[in-house]
């Protein structure tokens, strides 16, 4: 074999080997996120007139990117097992962050026991969250719906995997919390982001109620609304008893009470034990958090189980003092002994409508980013 033929033979053999060799798999995608800049920008909440500064946890300061991540997670059904529901399903902006249902159904169309509470000003709440106060703070609260079998019916291990594999979330978690790798995306960071977004759900200060109580706005209550305000706050001989539970800038005192919804033979007789399920204290059975009255006209139906469809029905309940049980709130007994008249109910109703904050429910920063 001469040199030319030998050269051709070797070249042919190399080409055959190259074509038949098993190709090497591509390098796996990098878990690292360090090539993405982390430059957190602090976000400052400006409270409306009459509101104090919000207390923010030291381990979860508000940042622009943290809030943006929380907003996406809030409106993303990725948190549910079948990707059909999310936080937004029970907390719609049009209903002041409620769903306007007596009770809410999860992904399996199983109804829960209670109405969704409004998230308006939830960052100011203390003494527990939910109707029964079972979560200490927003970070703890955000973890519960995902694994609740009646709500999103997912588990956080799966959610963490979905978030790590997502096309956008690793970058967003990096920008929000400075993590170095996708594997560092955790449920706790997701809960922190959700809590940051929820802390931005604050009143605008532009309701008629707020403007009428702020000097220099030129807004005044009507005569009927003024009478309702007097009854609400016991500024006259008659006391509507409203301001005892629905007081301060939040229009709630964050206390759990039995407001005489059900009559029971003994304190074990409540179908829904409310606060008692959390504390295991018999005297807490049948007690529920006093909700805020801000945007109350937008959050029907009312009470923890949505039993009252209208505010008129609510006032009728309070006008009669409700039903007796051993731990009924003393205020209800006073109402029973001194019931509201029809003109008094109408005046209080007029005042309640001044608490509607249309600026809040039209805030574009609180809408879905998708």
Question: Could you describe each region identified by the protein language model?
Answer:
Residues 156-175, 179, 183-204, 297, ...:
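C-terminal capping alpha-helices of c-type cytochrome domains
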Residues 21:
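Short, conserved catalytic or interaction motifs in soluble domains
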Residues 17-18:
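C-terminal motif of bacterial Sec signal peptides marking the signal peptidase cleavage site
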Residues 1-8:
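Bacterial N-terminal signal peptides that target proteins for export
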Residues 83-86, 115, 134, 155, ...:
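Generic hydrophobic, aliphatic-rich segments that mediate packing or membrane embedding
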Residues 24-144, 207-309, 313-317, 322-327, ...:
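Short glycine/threonine-rich turn/loop motifs
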Residues 149-154:
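A gly/proline- and charged-residue-enriched helix-loop-helix capping module
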């Amino acid at each position: 074999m001469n040199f030319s033929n030998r050269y051709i033979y070797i070249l042919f053999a190399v080409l055959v080997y190259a074509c038949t060799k098993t190709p090497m798999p591509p390098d796996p995608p990098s878990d690292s996120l360090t090539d993405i800049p982390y430059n957190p920008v602090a976000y400052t909440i400006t409270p409306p007139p009459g509101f104090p500064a919000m207390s923010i946890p030291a381990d979860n300061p508000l940042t622009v990117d943290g809030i943006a991540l929380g907003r996406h997670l809030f409106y993303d059904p990725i948190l549910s097992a079948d990707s059909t529901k999310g936080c937004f399903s029970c907390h719609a902006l049009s209903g002041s962050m409620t769903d306007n249902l007596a009770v809410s159904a999860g992904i399996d169309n199983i109804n829960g026991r209670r109405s969704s509470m409004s998230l308006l000003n939830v960052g100011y709440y203390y003494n527990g969250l939910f109707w029964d106060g079972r979560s200490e703070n927003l970070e703890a609260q955000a973890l519960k719906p995902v694994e609740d079998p009646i709500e999103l019916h997912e588990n956080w291990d799966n959610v963490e995997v979905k978030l790590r594999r997502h096309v956008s979330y690793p970058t967003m978690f990096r920008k929000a919390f400075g993590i170095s790798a996708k594997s560092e995306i955790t449920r706790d960071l997701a809960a922190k982001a959700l809590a940051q977004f929820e802390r931005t759900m604050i009143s605008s200060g532009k309701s008629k109620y707020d403007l009428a109580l702020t000097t220099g706005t030129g807004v005044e209550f009507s005569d009927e609304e003024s009478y309702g305000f007097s009854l609400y706050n016991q500024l006259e001989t008659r006391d509507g008893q409203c301001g005892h539970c629905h007081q301060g800038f939040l229009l709630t005192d964050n206390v759990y009470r039995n407001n005489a919804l059900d009559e029971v033979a003994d304190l074990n007789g409540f179908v829904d034990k409310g606060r008692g399920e959390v504390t295991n204290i018999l005297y807490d059975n049948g007690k529920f958090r006093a909700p805020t009255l801000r945007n109350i006209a937008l959050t029907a139906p009312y009470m923890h189980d949505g039993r009252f469809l209208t505010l008129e029905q609510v006032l009728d309940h309070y006008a009669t003092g409700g039903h007796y049980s051993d731990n009924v709130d003393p205020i209800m007994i006073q109402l029973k002994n001194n019931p509201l008249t029809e003109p008094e109910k109408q005046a209080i109703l007029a005042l309640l409508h001044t608490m509607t904050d249309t600026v809040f429910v039209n805030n574009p920063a609180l809408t879905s980013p998708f």
